[in-house]
Amino acid sequence: MSQVILDLQLACEDNSGLPEESQFQTWLNAVIPQFQEESEVTIRVVDSAESHCLNLTYRGKDKPTNVLSFPFEVPPGMEMSLLGDLVICRQVVEKEAQEQGKPLEAHWAHMVVHGSLHLLGYDHIEDDEAEEMEALETEIMLALGYEDPYIAEKE
């Protein structure tokens, strides 16, 4: 049976009201075992300041962002199950959910699904890549019992 090992790091000034570790685990399990037998993923939930700093350092964008994905590149000749790290910004996720009229839990789930697909090598820079990635995200979100996260864009 496929297994995803989760290292959850809650690094917000106030960690109350965040999803439970079991929810993060469920969301990861909905994505990664489809592609990989065994994996280890770190999810770090942060405040805007840390997200801003990381986004500026690694993407050159001077603002916080919802989710950053840092895939782990296994050195040649080594076998490791470490897939990578997701850094999710609490304030951005909460603000986006409110602005987009989405249930907060569903938006958290979407950020984990979206970030996990990035760790697995999916991207959305080119239109065809974006369509493939969004279709996978939608399929996974529906399987989890949530709405299509892109439904507003399709209407």
From Swiss-Prot:
A Pfam family that the UniProt record links to this protein: YbeY
Alphabetized PROSITE patterns for the sequence: UPF0054
Broad class of where this protein is predominantly found: cytoplasm
GO biological process terms held by the UniProt record: rRNA processing
One Gene Ontology CC term in the entry: cytoplasm
Binding locations of Zn(2+): 114, 118, 124
Record-listed E.C. numbers: 3.1.-.-
Subcellular location: Cytoplasm
GO molecular function: metalloendopeptidase activity; RNA endonuclease activity; zinc ion binding
Co-factor: note: Binds 1 zinc ion.
Keywords in alphabetical order: Cytoplasm, Endonuclease, Hydrolase, Metal-binding, Nuclease, Ribosome biogenesis, rRNA processing, Zinc
Names of the cofactor(s): Zn(2+)
Function: Single strand-specific metallo-endoribonuclease involved in late-stage 70S ribosome quality control and in maturation of the 3' terminus of the 16S rRNA.
Entry similarity comment: Belongs to the endoribonuclease YbeY family.
UniProt protein name: Endoribonuclease YbeY
Gene: ybeY
